[in-house]
């Protein structure tokens, strides 16, 4: 029987917190855009309740992975095999990494929002705050999450990479659909929060 592998519980906590922070950044980040010429010209920031749709989609996909797909893929965690599966630190499978999926999804969503808001809704004008909130913040949290999952011996590099890349793709697609279907402007109400 293979020995029970060591896992770093601190990295498990850190990566869970950074995963939630990355996803939360997309939930709380306003849409920043250069407004239409028909209204007051200049940079605007509007929060949209409709951002719940792509964020909850990514949350549902992460839960599907954690509670269903991992059992179907049966990718063993580092140090686990058929002889010690079910014992301490080998109770669950690692493929694909849910934390890396969520971190990648947050980054993909943020990149899509930034690209569409910059190119379509702002006429190519780049806003530094939008770049920081939509791209840099989820990138930093996603990298800490991905590195921590490997350093803490929770998942293999392949499990982390697959989770992150699949999340990046799904996040980008959902963010693209959201930003193309939902204008950043709240209309003529001037509200900061749009439905």
Q: Can you name each region flagged by the protein language model?
A:
Residues 113-114, 174, 182:
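A short hydrophobic/aromatic micro-motif that marks alpha-helical segments and, especially, helix-coil
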Residues 182-195:
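Primarily interfacial, aromatic-capped hydrophobic alpha-helices that serve as membrane anchors
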Residues 1-150:
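Hydrophobic alpha-helical bundle signature of multipass membrane enzymes
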């Amino acid at each position: 029987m293979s020995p029970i592998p060591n896992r770093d519980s601190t990295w498990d906590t850190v990566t869970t917190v950074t995963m939630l922070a990355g996803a939360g950044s997309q939930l709380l980040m306003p849409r920043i855009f250069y407004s239409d010429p028909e209204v007051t010209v200049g940079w605007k920031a509007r929060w949209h309740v409709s951002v719940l749709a792509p964020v909850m989609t990514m949350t549902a996909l992460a839960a599907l992975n954690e509670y269903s797909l991992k059992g179907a893929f049966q990718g063993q965690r580092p140090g686990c095999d058929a002889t010690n599966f079910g014992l301490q630190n080998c109770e669950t499978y690692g493929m694909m990494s849910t934390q890396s999926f969520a971190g990648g999804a947050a980054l993909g969503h943020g990149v899509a929002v930034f690209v569409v808001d910059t190119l379509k809704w702002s006429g190519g004008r780049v806003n530094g705050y939008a770049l920081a909130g939509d791209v840099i913040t989820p990138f930093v949290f996603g990298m800490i999450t991905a590195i921590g999952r490997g350093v803490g011996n929770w998942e293999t590099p392949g499990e982390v990479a697959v989770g992150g890349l699949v999340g990046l793709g799904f996040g980008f697609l959902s963010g693209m659909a959201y930003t193309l279907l939902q204008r950043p402007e709240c209309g003529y109400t001037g509200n900061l929060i749009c439905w």
